[in-house]
């Protein structure tokens, strides 16, 4: 601890106490600051160490809290993702099942349509075959129907003529002034025509006329001027003959078709 460049009194000597000079004062004067500096350094180091430990502990706590927060968020995110994945898996399974059901329904519907198409084609082929078979019969039916409709028109015209004559005959029968001979002449004329006319003969009108002449005695009141209000049986026969005409038309057509 001696500085060779300094004067002797500035150096600390071990034996300065033996000289009885001011060396001790210098020693104490230098020792006190050094001790204060050492104490300050020790205190400062201790406080610094405490601050460092305190900051380190705070940092550790913050780090631990941050890590726990991250772990909690991570686990929450994992749980949420798992729930989302489970939900999506369930929805996907439902969609797959629904798609499978639709596919099966479409396949079944397609098979059904194919079967219906086959049946329709078979029915169409059968109808076409029946049409080819029926076509000649249809032509024959239309031809016979046309012929019988012509006959029906002639029969209706004949019935209209007989209706007019029978109405006149019944009017004479109910009249108090017209001669009986005129009525008998009309009756005779009607019977002759019913016998010689082929349509009237086919309807067997002669027997009906005879029945009318013998039994139709109905007349309107004395002041009646409407000839159509006289007679009852004659109107029934006229209606009956109209029905016979219609019936005979279809029976003749049927017989003609069956003969072919």
UniProtKB/Swiss-Prot annotation:
Entry annotated with the keyword Protease: no
Entry-linked InterPro entries: CCDC127
PANTHER family per UniProt: COILED-COIL DOMAIN-CONTAINING PROTEIN 127 (PTHR31958:SF2)
Keyword Signal attributed: no
Keywords carried by this UniProt record: Coiled coil
Phylogenetic lineage: Eukaryota, Metazoa, Chordata, Craniata, Vertebrata
Protein encoded by which gene: CCDC127
Protein name, as recorded: Coiled-coil domain-containing protein 127
Parts forming coiled coils: 49-135
An annotated GO cellular component: mitochondrion
Transmembrane segments: none
Origin: domain of life: Eukaryota
